[in-house]
Amino acid sequence: MNTATCFIVLLVVATVIGGIEAGEFDMRKDVMGLFRRAICPGADRPCAACCPCCPGTSCKAESNGVFYCRKDEP
């Protein structure tokens, strides 16, 4: 294996281990789920106008002026 292939394998392994340690057992297995997680921040994460929040959350300002994705209330 060359260096680039080893790097990619290590990156994939680290991503899988990180997902398991974070408790994300219900991660969507389809391609759209992977794409959505890559482009939108989840709940309780900082957000910006260029990166909209994931479905079910919206960008709300906190008292410190920082915007966070918060779960929508029914």
Curated annotation (Swiss-Prot):
<dbReference type="InterPro" id="IPR012499">
    <property type="entry name" value="Toxin_16"/>
</dbReference>
<feature type="site" description="Critical for the neurotoxic activity">
    <location>
        <position position="68"/>
    </location>
</feature>
<dbReference type="GO" id="GO:0005576">
    <property type="term" value="C:extracellular region"/>
</dbReference>
<feature type="signal peptide">
    <location>
        <begin position="1"/>
        <end position="22"/>
    </location>
</feature>
<comment type="function">
    <text>This excitatory toxin inhibits insect calcium-activated potassium (KCa) channels (Slo-type).</text>
</comment>
<feature type="site" description="Important for the neurotoxic activity">
    <location>
        <position position="66"/>
    </location>
</feature>
<keyword id="KW-0165">Cleavage on pair of basic residues</keyword>
<feature type="disulfide bond">
    <location>
        <begin position="53"/>
        <end position="69"/>
    </location>
</feature>
<keyword id="KW-0632">Potassium channel impairing toxin</keyword>
<keyword id="KW-1015">Disulfide bond</keyword>
<keyword id="KW-1221">Calcium-activated potassium channel impairing toxin</keyword>
<feature type="propeptide">
    <location>
        <begin position="23"/>
        <end position="35"/>
    </location>
</feature>
<feature type="site" description="Critical for the neurotoxic activity">
    <location>
        <position position="45"/>
    </location>
</feature>
<comment type="similarity">
    <text>Belongs to the neurotoxin 11 (kappa toxin) family.</text>
</comment>
<dbReference type="Pfam" id="PF07945">
    <property type="entry name" value="Toxin_16"/>
</dbReference>
<keyword id="KW-0872">Ion channel impairing toxin</keyword>
<keyword id="KW-0800">Toxin</keyword>
<feature type="disulfide bond">
    <location>
        <begin position="40"/>
        <end position="54"/>
    </location>
</feature>
<feature type="disulfide bond">
    <location>
        <begin position="50"/>
        <end position="51"/>
    </location>
</feature>
<feature type="site" description="Critical for the neurotoxic activity">
    <location>
        <position position="51"/>
    </location>
</feature>
<dbReference type="GO" id="GO:0015459">
    <property type="term" value="F:potassium channel regulator activity"/>
</dbReference>
<dbReference type="GO" id="GO:0090729">
    <property type="term" value="F:toxin activity"/>
</dbReference>
<feature type="site" description="Important for the neurotoxic activity">
    <location>
        <position position="39"/>
    </location>
</feature>
<keyword id="KW-0732">Signal</keyword>
<keyword id="KW-0960">Knottin</keyword>
<keyword id="KW-0528">Neurotoxin</keyword>
<protein>
    <recommendedName>
        <fullName>Lambda-hexatoxin-Hv1e</fullName>
    </recommendedName>
</protein>
<feature type="site" description="Critical for the neurotoxic activity">
    <location>
        <position position="50"/>
    </location>
</feature>
<feature type="site" description="Critical for the neurotoxic activity">
    <location>
        <position position="46"/>
    </location>
</feature>
<keyword id="KW-0964">Secreted</keyword>
<feature type="disulfide bond">
    <location>
        <begin position="47"/>
        <end position="59"/>
    </location>
</feature>
